[in-house]
């Protein structure tokens, strides 16, 4: 699964996920993309599950790019532990997603196959998404 190899600090504050995606909002590498229309967090497991769904559907047909990376640690305290005594340990990694962000890209397959593969991938994700095609000349 995806996670950073090294970080300067182990834990991070929660923060707020606001605004729209300005970077990574266009299909840059492939012909088709899966773009987020909702906002939220994608865990490394969800990103991997969607990637597997895409790969399984297109078989050996095309090429896939994952445009997001889970670089934010989420800490959790163990079950049945009293409040206080510091922050919990990092449990998993997430990518903060803003509306407009392209999550996955694909090339080398037909549009119908890409649409179906992205539909299967979107079912694995907790945010709303839409299918986008690359604008030639843009």
UniProtKB/Swiss-Prot annotation:
Protein keywords: Ribonucleoprotein, Ribosomal protein, RNA-binding, rRNA-binding, tRNA-binding
Source organism, top-level taxon: Bacteria
Hydrolase listed as a keyword: no
S-S bonds: none
Chain's role: Binds 23S rRNA and is also seen to make contacts with the A and possibly P site tRNAs.
Quaternary assembly: Part of the 50S ribosomal subunit.
Taxon lineage: Bacteria, Pseudomonadati, Pseudomonadota, Betaproteobacteria, Burkholderiales
Name of protein: Large ribosomal subunit protein uL16
Any Gene Ontology CC annotation: cytosolic large ribosomal subunit
Organism: Bordetella avium (strain 197N)
Basic residues: bias regions: 1-13
GO annotation, biological process: translation
Keyword match rRNA-binding: yes
UniProt record similarity statement: Belongs to the universal ribosomal protein uL16 family.
Membrane-spanning residues: none
GO-annotated molecular function: rRNA binding; structural constituent of ribosome; tRNA binding
Ranges where the record places region Disordered: 1-20
